[in-house]
Amino acid sequence: MASQYAAELCMLLVEDNFGELFGRIFSTLHRYERLTLPRLLGLTRLSENRLRAALVAMIQHHLVHFYTAVEEGGVTYYSANMQAAYYLIRSGKILEFVEDRLGKYAATVMSTIMYLGHAQVSHLDTLPELRSDASKTNGVNEGEHDRPEGENETNGTNGEHVSDQPALLHPTLKALAGHGYIVRVREAHFQSIADNILNIERQIRSGDSVQSMKGKKLEEFVVEKTADMLKERLDGDLTRGLIVNGVPRGVKRSQTNGVSDDNETEKARFDYDDGEDEDEENEWLDDEVPMESSLTVRVNYEKLDVALRNRRFLELAERGAPPESAQIYDYLLRRIEYQTSKCRDASEIPREGEEGEQYSVPIPLSALARDIDPYLDLAGSLGPTNTPANNRLGKRTFDDTVDDNDDDHGATGNRTYEIDQHLSLLAQPPLNLTSKRLNGGIINWTVEFRHLARKLRHLELERIVEARYGDVALRVLRVLQAKGKLDEKRLQEISLLPFKDLRQVLASMQTGGFVDLQEVPRDAQRQPSRTIYLWYYDPDRARDSMLQDTYKAMSRCLQRLKFERGRLKDFLEKTERSDVKGNEELYLSEGELDRLREWRAKEALLIGEVARLDDMIAVMRDY
């Protein structure tokens, strides 16, 4: 990620969110990589007290890694954390997702943790913005409808029973931890992966267990042991004890009848039962035990990437399958999400053709059948399975009419079969969204992550090619992707395009970096007349080129936003005054109101464009 445009983007994000001082230190650390404090003082030309205070704050927000080298006399090195800086751009998307999944108060808690970088539970207990919501809200039930303003009343008459209900902070923290959206902060989180690996390898090689090993056997042992110890050091999982039968504790199954008038946000929110635990307990009983007050938590961006990736997979299903099949797929992805910690094990971007298959955890069909809304119509979207018998007059017999008792008996037996049929539909080409597995005679369904991530990348590249060069270029791209390297004559025969149009399209795509030309001489003379020219499409090269172009476009959007804010600095300071904010029509003239509306529209356009470009980055790099 440490390219010129990526570094420029991260520096702009840090400066926009934390100010010029943080941006100056971050850009210096990225430019010179690992630096000691005296060296950083000389390069930034800041006072020591100011630099130390800034470094402490940046370490708290995980923008800076530090490592103390004991073998060098306790010298501390500092380095920039590019990934944490980039995730600043995804914070709004994450908060929107958490609010959709767990409610508005959970999004407020997550926003507070993001704002602090990491926080102790005891400190979160003291924050007024989290306590005030607890006294105004009636509970924290997943999937709860947001009430209109003025209807969020306290639990009791005139607030006399507010203390009877536990505060919402600890149940919400448990819900966030159960879903994996927050993790425990470990000491290794403040160090870079390279420093952690170096420290672990040094520790292993100095141990007694490797003294008798040599050569290849020693290297294999060190690599294997390093991977295990690194995973253990970075493990901040808090889901232990909060997951029951594969789903977070306290999550209840949705009881909608499938004919409700809820908005799309509520329809997309599926809740799960605790499984086979049928005790009708008060849901607050589990939440009466507070989280450990000394526990320090932070946002788990890797887990949230998994959730956002599953949302993209669901969009593929919604575009190509019936709504009922897409809803079943959502249940399957939700189950898989709870047991998937990160999108992929390797940090580097996998090359095309070199990444192997990576299947999700298998989800039993019986577990899905318990999760899915019993009122969801599954048979209607599949169509009739058999043709009803008619009598000689062409009419249905009396026995073919609907019998409620028979339907009740058949519904239980056929529902699992119907769910299996919907998932089988999603497994068929061209969707290929699911995979069926048999384990000891039990039907399990999985998702092949690498195949779907590759499909998302190809669809994104095809969309860009079609938008830039037209549908003819898209046809040529698909031919080259399917057939490999082709000469111009063979490419023309397959694509059924005139030579003139084909050459124009190929020249344009070559300039854009999507296709390239390989020269294969027939003899040692290498004469042009004795050379074969093969056109080919390299998806890895196209992806890398698109990544750099996208980083550059995002940087330009942020720079333009910064310029526009500077141009309207005095006016925006006036609109952000505490007495003016919310009462603009009282304090601003008509011209100023028009100017404010114009600015907000321009700001929304630029920020929306950055968010759209971030979706492309996620597909090309993170998924």
UniProtKB/Swiss-Prot annotation:
Job of this protein: DNA-dependent RNA polymerase catalyzes the transcription of DNA into RNA using the four ribonucleoside triphosphates as substrates. Specific core component of RNA polymerase III which synthesizes small RNAs, such as 5S rRNA and tRNAs.
Region (Leucine-zipper): 550-571
Subunit structure: Component of the RNA polymerase III (Pol III) complex consisting of 17 subunits.
Protein name: DNA-directed RNA polymerase III subunit rpc3
Major location category of this protein: nucleus
Coiled coil start-end: none
Family designation: Belongs to the RNA polymerase beta chain family.
GO (cellular component) term, any one: RNA polymerase III complex
Gene name of this polypeptide: rpc82
Acidic residues: bias regions: 273-282
GO terms for MF: single-stranded DNA binding
Pfam families according to UniProt: HTH_9 (PF08221), POLR3C_WHD (PF22536), RNA_pol_Rpc82 (PF05645)
Keyword presence, Magnesium: no
Biological process (GO), any one: DNA-templated transcription
Taxonomic lineage from the root: Eukaryota, Fungi, Dikarya, Ascomycota, Pezizomycotina
Top-rank taxon, per record: Eukaryota
Family matches, as InterPro entries: POLR3C_WHD, RNA_pol_III_RPC82-rel_HTH, RNA_pol_III_Rpc82_C, RPC3, WH-like_DNA-bd_sf
